[in-house]
């Protein structure tokens, strides 16, 4: 009995050991992590794609052709969407922003294209005989005398329609546009004739700025910093995503920034390096200051033919008083504004005195406030604006204006580059324009003395990039990376669609889950992927309409070319992502498990740390150095899987025996059979011929082909008797050599018999093999069934044992509890009886004592 118990215990331990081993293997397998591909994750990186424009060009004057080419832009969105990104911090750098460079090149190209069809003024590089203008009106205003000095009445010889004929023409030129040939002489020439070519702006080209919205192509996004005190560089904690910027007016000006955006809070000082006096300082005001500029002279314009098909527009006469152009600014508002700027600068230089002074010198465009007003280019002296002495004496109760004396030029040095100039045709009538000063461009003087207590700031400008930078400081373009990889436990399994029910996130933008954890963001993949594709389709439709609108033009504008580029770029981005998904075997899937094991060297963080605490942006930075390695492993894994599937498909042809009887297979069998038979017959013929040739060489001469030779009879038959005329013996005879057909028949018969015997043997072997396999399979099934029954009985036995043990445990517990209860009750009874017997015992004691 003891031996039987030991044997049973050993058997049980063996079974439990196997079960424990398999449980350990399953748990170990479940602990592995595998690479999972996600499409539509909110991840981005800095990028420099080609941007396209949107504008409401139709809302402006259609009679003139604006040089900005906004008629070729897509229409603006009437309800632009701006999506805030919670828990997102992004670094911005306005001084290294590709959007600024791109806008700068676009404006240059637009100016060049706008002036291409216009007239070249090379024929005007002739000697000009100029005299002062005679004013018939008697006035004593100093501004008139100043205006008289500003313009000259010039005569010059010009070519007519016939090149060999010349005639004299008269025109008024500004003094800034001509230079004397000799000192004290009345002979002049145009100022740019010896340095650059001059192109006259087309008369119907408008230079008035129209707001331009820069938009990112599909697959990209524009991030916007909404911090009110953002200085242009560093981290921004209030970030949103937009598809287009706000309307930016391409105002070309120096010293003062006009018609831009104002700061929402306090005045902001933006600089790249304040200690470097060569760097510009951009000031954004929180309140705009109105500046009103006018050219009071009522000018007329006349056209002068300077050659076949060429017309030069010049100032013909000035009707009424000749007064100098000027600008007016409210002294109270300006001084308050300058005082705010001074206070902001004082924070950066706490122990020094801040002073403002006029420009120290340079080109006219830099030393003055240059801008375009109604088609004329004004150059205004800002000495009265930047004057610290007047600022200290300022009385806030005054309502006076600061007047800036302005000069006008018609020959403009093109700010786009050196060696090019533009002639602005004169504008008829009185010119007046109102603008808003929204910012300043300043530079700091270098410290001439080491212990100087003053910091001097002067107005500056000239680099139009700073003008665009003052508006684009809060934007940056990023490329959306919808593909993400992360470790998960499942390995190449398909998640059922019913498990991804409605998520209630249909109103989230593509990057709306950027600040969420990876686990929360992965829920919105369907919405984000759908919005990515719909955004591509919508933008492609808008761009195509804008391109079709330009078909009547012989040459696309800058915007048309950029629209084509962005159209191609968006499609390339989408196709590239889809190609990667296809290479990895994840086409059409938002969450795609793979068979690539996760390497802990890529990231050793746990599942909870990754999915519950990290955003997709943080995770992307975590594994950015290993992304290429993971992508290569995904490709290798998919190639191996494709190879395995190909091998499996090759085996599937033999999966069904009925495929053997397919007509195409039988045709293949017949071809093989015919080749085998033909080969055997050919070999027999060759060997027969070789045998005959060999015998002939040995001297053998065959008998007649019809000679019969007797076939030996059997030993049980007697020979015939000729004399008695008995029956002749029926001896069998064979031919010595058969004919070709007979030989072919014998060979074919032998081959068929050989094939029959071999096939019969093969069928018998196959039948025997199938029989053995059937018996083995039957035995295996029987053993499996017995094993299952044994396992079932084992489970049943242990279930009964556990049931009995539980019953015994309950019985024992009940007995123990019952006995304990009885003993407790008995103890209580004894105590109660003893308590009740106390009087009796006392009485009995007293009785005993009294007796």
Swiss-Prot record:
Gene: env
Segments on the Cytoplasmic side according to the record's topology features: 694-851
UniProt lineage: Viruses, Riboviria, Pararnavirae, Artverviricota, Revtraviricetes
GO terms, biological process: clathrin-dependent endocytosis of virus by host cell; fusion of virus membrane with host endosome membrane; fusion of virus membrane with host plasma membrane; positive regulation of plasma membrane raft polarization; positive regulation of receptor clustering; viral protein processing; virion attachment to host cell
InterPro entries according to UniProt: Gp120_core_sf, Gp160, GP41-like, HIV1_Gp120
Coiled-coil ranges (or none): 621-655
Keywords of this entry: AIDS, Apoptosis, Clathrin-mediated endocytosis of virus by host, Cleavage on pair of basic residues, Coiled coil, Disulfide bond, Fusion of virus membrane with host endosomal membrane, Fusion of virus membrane with host membrane, Glycoprotein, Host cell membrane, Host endosome, Host membrane, Host-virus interaction, Lipoprotein, Membrane, Palmitate, Signal, Transmembrane, Transmembrane helix, Viral attachment to host cell, Viral envelope protein, Viral immunoevasion, Viral penetration into host cytoplasm, Virion, Virus endocytosis by host, Virus entry into host cell
Glycosylated residues, chain numbering: 87, 135, 141, 153, 157, 183, 194, 238, 259, 273, 286, 298, 328, 335, 351, 381, 387, 395, 401, 436, 599, 604, 613, 625, 662
Post-translational modification comment from the UniProt entry: Highly glycosylated by host. The high number of glycan on the protein is reffered to as 'glycan shield' because it contributes to hide protein sequence from adaptive immune system.
UniProt-annotated stretches for the region Immunosuppression: 562-580
Protein name: Envelope glycoprotein gp160
Pfam family for this entry, one: GP41
Record's signal peptide: 1-31
Extracellular face of the membrane: 32-672
Residues with lipid group (S-palmitoyl cysteine): 752
Region (Fusion peptide): 501-520
């Amino acid at each position: 009995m003891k031996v039987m118990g030991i044997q049973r215990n050993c058997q049980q331990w063996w079974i439990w050991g196997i079960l424990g081993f398999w449980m350990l293997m399953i748990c170990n397998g479940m602990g592995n992590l595998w690479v999972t591909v996600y499409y539509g994750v909110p991840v981005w990186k800095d990028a420099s794609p080609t941007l396209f424009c949107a504008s409401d060009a139709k809302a402006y004057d259609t009679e003139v052709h604006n040089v900005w080419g906004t008629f070729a832009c897509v229409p603006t969105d009437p309800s632009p969407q701006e999506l805030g990104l919670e828990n997102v911090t992004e670094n911005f750098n306005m001084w290294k922003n590709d959007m600024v460079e791109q806008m700068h090149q676009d404006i240059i190209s637009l100016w060049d294209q706008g002036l291409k069809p216009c007239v070249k003024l090379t024929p005007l590089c002739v000697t000009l005989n100029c005299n002062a203008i005679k004013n018939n009106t008697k006035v004593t205003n100093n501004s008139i005398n100043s205006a008289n000095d500003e313009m000259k009445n010039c005569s010059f010889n010009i070519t007519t329609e016939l090149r060999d004929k010349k005639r004299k023409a008269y025109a008024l030129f500004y003094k800034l546009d001509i230079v004397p040939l000799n000192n004290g002489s009345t002979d002049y020439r145009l100022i740019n004739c010896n340095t650059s070519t001059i192109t006259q702006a087309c008369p119907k080209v408008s230079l008035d700025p129209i707001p331009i919205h820069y938009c990112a192509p599909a697959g990209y996004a524009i991030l916007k910093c909404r911090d009110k005190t953002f200085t242009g560089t560093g981290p921004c904690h209030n970030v949103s995503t937009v598809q287009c910027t706000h309307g930016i007016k391409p105002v070309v000006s120096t010293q003062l920034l006009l018609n831009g955006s104002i700061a929402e809070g306090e005045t902001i000082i933006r600089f790249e390096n304040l200690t470097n006096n060569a760097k510009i300082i951009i000031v954004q005001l929180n309140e705009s200051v109105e500046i009103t500029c006018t050219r009071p002279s009522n000018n007329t314009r006349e056209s002068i033919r300077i050659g076949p098909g060429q017309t030069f527009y010049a100032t013909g006469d000035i009707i009424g008083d000749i007064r100098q152009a000027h600008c007016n600014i409210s002294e109270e508002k300006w001084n308050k504004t300058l005082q705010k700027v001074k206070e902001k600068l004082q924070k950066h230089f706490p122990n020094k005195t801040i002073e403002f002074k006029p420009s120290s010198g340079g080109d006219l465009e830099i030393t003055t406030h240059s801008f375009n007003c109604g088609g004329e280019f004004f150059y205004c002296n800002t000495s009265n604006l930047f004057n610290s002495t007047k600022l200290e004496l300022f009385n806030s109760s005054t309502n006076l204006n600061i007047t800036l004396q302005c000069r006008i030029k018609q020959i403009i040095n093109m700010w786009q580059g050196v060696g090019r100039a533009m002639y602005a045709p004169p504008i008829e009538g009185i010119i007046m324009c109102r603008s808003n000063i929204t910012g300043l461009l300043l530079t700091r003087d270098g410290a001439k003395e080491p212990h100087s207590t003053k910091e001097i700031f002067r107005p500056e400008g000239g680099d139009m990039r700073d003008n665009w930078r003052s508006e684009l400081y809060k934007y940056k373009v990023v490329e959306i990376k919808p593909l993400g990889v992360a470790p998960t436990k499942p390995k190449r399994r398909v998640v059922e669609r019913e498990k991804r029910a409605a998520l209630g996130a249909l109103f989230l933008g593509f990057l709306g889950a950027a600040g969420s954890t990876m686990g929360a963001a992965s829920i919105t993949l369907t919405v984000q992927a759908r919005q990515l594709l719909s955004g591509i389709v919508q933008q492609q439709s808008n761009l195509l309409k804008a391109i079709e609108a330009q078909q009547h033009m012989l040459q696309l504008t800058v915007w048309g070319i950029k629209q084509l580029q962005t159209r191609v770029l968006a499609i390339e981005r989408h196709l590239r992502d889809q190609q990667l998904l296809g290479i990895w075997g994840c086409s059409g899937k938002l969450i795609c498990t793979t068979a690539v094991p996760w390497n802990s060297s890529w990231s050793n963080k746990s599942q909870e740390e990754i999915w519950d605490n990290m955003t997709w942006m943080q995770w992307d930075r975590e594994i950015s150095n290993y992304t290429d390695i993971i992508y290569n492993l995904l490709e290798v894994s998919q190639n191996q899987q494709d190879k395995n599937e190909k091998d499996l498909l090759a085996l599937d042809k033999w999966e069904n025996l009925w495929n053997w009887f397919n007509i195409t297979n039988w045709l293949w069998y017949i071809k093989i059979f015919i080749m085998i038979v033909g080969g055997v017959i050919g070999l027999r013929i060759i060997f027969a011929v070789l045998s005959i040739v060999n015998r002939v060489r040995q001297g053998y001469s065959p008998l007649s082909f019809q000679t019969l030779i007797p076939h030996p009879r059997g030993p049980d038959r007697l020979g015939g008797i000729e004399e008695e005329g008995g029956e002749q013996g029926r001896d069998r005879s064979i031919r010595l050599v058969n004919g070709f057909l007979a030989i072919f028949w014998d060979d074919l018969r032998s081959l068929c018999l050989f094939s029959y015997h071999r096939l019969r043997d093969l069928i018998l072997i196959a039948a025997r093999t199938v029989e053995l396999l059937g018996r083995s399979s039957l035995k295996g099934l029987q053993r499996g069934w017995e094993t299952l029954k044994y396992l079932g009985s084992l489970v049943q036995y242990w279930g009964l044992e556990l049931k009995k043990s539980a019953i015994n445990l309950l019985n024992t517990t009940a007995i123990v509890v019952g006995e304990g209860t009885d003993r407790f009750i008995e103890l209580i009874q004894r105590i109660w009886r003893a308590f009740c017997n106390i009087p009796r015992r006392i009485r009995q004691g007293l009785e005993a004592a009294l007796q």
